[in-house]
């Protein structure tokens, strides 16, 4: 996500922030808490979650199917390993 267009990066991070504030989906906050508790910084935890958000958006657009909650949660649970690794 570091080489991403700055406007797109900010938008993805805004999605992450909104998910954390709304607790929707709750797995985003659970993942954030797990990452921070493991010693990952706030900023890095948000960036990692943003990578999962961007990966899910890519999959939705590529497959022309609705958001897949199970796939999203599976990717969150694997962090800090990124979806494409």
Task: Place the predicted regions along the sequence by residue.
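Structure-specific DNA junction-binding interface
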Residues: 1-85
